[in-house]
């Protein structure tokens, strides 16, 4: 994406080489430039296999590794290095729908940071992973989401600290984080669409929670260090339990998990007693992937439009049953966000459409919907309700 759209648009990831395939490129760069590198095995977690190096000889030849330029001037909290674990929820890939959790975990190292190569082997100084630092004699847990103490803070505590103590514009910083999150998910969109078509029978089965690890440098610039596709939900500390517990609740409410209709009579009776209503299992009509030829024709015509003004004028005029199902799902999610923020699509995110490998109809549909009803959702919802009363979405 950086090669295609330039570093001006994709400059939020430190220079990274995938080894052993890109070892020659790493070798050439290290010959011309001094610097520190953090090397880690792909797919590893909890700080396993990570080390900080300055020479190519310190990196194994043939192992699968990721070498990333180390940010040697991070922002510090009382002299301590830290990073931020953010939670990103993908509820759909076509159309793309992304939510960013407003709370997160700030993980602090346990030894004061020294910018000196003689200290590169000190894992308690350079690694912020709680799974590493909990073995440090200096580690202090935190049981309060409102206090800036110990080696783990809540994200809201960090924002409050940076705002009041250092005068940081948190809204501007949050917008930068949203920007890098959206661009990162778009960079994987084409691959995820292709994979989902092969493995997913229904869009209702598609959702994924990601852990984004972000570091602030000395200028408060956010850098994306890595993305975890299976972030730990273990309550390692009292604060973890508080944050992750609420996260799990909001996450499950938002994805709208559907109870399968394969339950026996006894199980259904128990479920109805718990939910105090009938029809708690999903409706198979909503799971249909069949799209009529009229739907396909409309989609084809609008995907060929290369002007936003053109499709904004026409795409919402005659909604198809398939359109209505997509829009119902969209509005249902928004009503259950909890502490998640919908960051894509919004009425302002149309500028990201140019970064997609391919223009997809449903992204255009939601862009138009957000433009028309994003600031007045009740009007759009009333329109959908009228169509649903006629069972138009099931036709």
Predicted regions and their residues:
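Short, acidic, Ser/Thr-enriched surface-loop or helix-capping motifs
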Residues: 217
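Glycine-rich phosphate-binding loop of ATP-grasp-fold ATP-dependent ligases
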Residues: 15-17, 34-60, 75, 84-85
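Hydrophobic residue at the +6 position relative to the catalytic HRD Asp in the kinase catalytic loop
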Residues: 212-214
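Acidic, PEST-like segments
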Residues: 1-4, 13-23, 29, 58, ...
